[in-house]
Curated annotation (Swiss-Prot):
Organism in which the protein naturally occurs: Caiman crocodilus apaporiensis (Rio Apaporis caiman)
HAMAP family (alphabetical): Lactate_dehydrog
Stored PANTHER family: L-2-HYDROXYCARBOXYLATE DEHYDROGENASE (NAD(P)(+)), L-LACTATE DEHYDROGENASE B CHAIN
EC number: 1.1.1.27
GO BP term, pick one: lactate metabolic process
Protein's name according to its UniProt entry: L-lactate dehydrogenase B chain
UniProt entry keywords in alphabetical sequence: Cytoplasm, NAD, Oxidoreductase
Annotated function: Interconverts simultaneously and stereospecifically pyruvate and lactate with concomitant interconversion of NADH and NAD(+).
Subunit relationships: Homotetramer.
Annotated residues for binding of substrate: R106, N138, R169, T248
Length: 333
């Protein structure tokens, strides 16, 4: 006897079993879930996979998202601790990793994350050999290098979320100072995501008007308007949010969805993300730093040759040296 479903539906052709635009998020902590929700909110994938080692938390997050399916345009939301669930992903977002313990050195933290990534990355490649990996876990520049080494992928398919968020914070703070929407305030934060990032004051503009031409002291200690404080706030803002609420997640989630939109829709937008910079600006080691990069469906296809001043280049090189001093001592890569 025919079932209700058979009475209701007449099949014409078999359904496609391989997703067109699948995204995986590895790690369902605060950052991973903010990324997942931001990606769903922008309707960027037809299938979203979540992976974590915490099975109950993972299942709970999956069910919670599935219950909102009516309000989303994502056909399928799946989750499992087995990486088979990630098969055929176009982009894999890695947010997993261990947290820094009190008094722990960065090298020790990075080494512990290397050990985590040694399990994660080969599993990703096994099931999605053609994917692009977007690394979000901190310290992001070093872990992007680690991912590149462990994955064997070409460098254009291993990208760090880098200074996309730092630049967004910069443009927001600039917009507050000027009373103009952040999208009309143009400025770039490059280099290391975090403490040694570089503000490119020479390129800061509104409608093509260079702010440094209007205020030649901008970004220096001589500046009576103290614009240098804006960059200082960018660097300190994450620490402040962590102090207030315990972690940061929403802004990085929006930032990641923004990067995914550029790649999933093949937009060729220029965004400050972490890429391999050996051979650029006199940097001699294999380090990943943020530069203005063109992102497309192929990954990171080009780097914009930004005209940097001597002091900005010196800061970039200093960042590179800092990162290399940690990377060169990493084991098992």
């Amino acid at each position: 006897m025919a079932t209700l479903k058979e009475k209701l539906i007449t099949h014409i052709a078999s359904e496609s079993t391989i997703p067109n635009n699948k995204v995986t998020v590895v790690g369902v902590g605060q950052v991973g879930m903010a990324c997942a929700v931001s990606i769903l909110g922008k309707s960027l994938c037809d299938e979203l996979a979540l992976v974590d080692v915490l099975e109950d938390k993972l299942k709970g997050e999956m069910m919670d998202l599935q219950h909102g399916s009516l309000f989303l345009q994502t056909h399928k939301i799946v989750a499992d601790k087995d990486y088979a669930v990630t098969a055929n992903s176009k982009i894999v977002v890695v947010t997993a990793g261990v947290r820094q313990q009190e008094g722990e050195s960065r090298l020790n933290l990075v080494q512990r994350n290397v050990n985590v990534f040694k399990f994660i990355i080969p599993q990703i490649i096994k099931y999605s050999p053609d994917c692009i990996i977007l690394v979000v876990s901190n310290p992001v520049d070093i872990l992007t290098y680690v991912t590149w080494k462990l994955s064997g992928l070409p460098k254009h398919r291993v990208i760090g979320s880098g200074c996309n968020l730092d630049s967004a914070r910069f443009r927001y703070l600039m917009s507050e100072k000027l009373g103009i929407h952040p999208s009309s305030c143009h400025g770039w934060i490059l280099g290391e995501h975090g403490d040694s990032s570089v503000a490119v004051w020479s390129g800061v503009n509104v409608a093509g008007v260079s702010l440094q031409e209007l205020n030649p002291a901008m970004g220096t200690d001589r500046d009576s308007e103290k614009w240098k404080e804006v960059h200082k706030q960018v660097v300190e803002s994450a620490y402040e949010v962590i102090k207030l609420k315990g972690y940061t997640n929403w802004a990085i989630g929006f930032s990641v969805a923004d990067l995914l939109e550029t790649m999933m829709k093949n937009l060729n937008r220029v965004q400050p993300v972490s890429t391999m910079v050996k051979g650029m600006y006199g940097i001699e080691n294999e380090v990943f730093l943020s530069l203005p990069c063109v992102l497309s469906a192929s990954g990171l296809t080009s780097v914009i040759n930004q005209k940097l001043k001597d002091d900005e280049v010196a800061q970039l090189r200093s960042s590179a040296d800092t990162l290399w001093s940690i990377q060169k001592d990493l084991k098992d890569l």
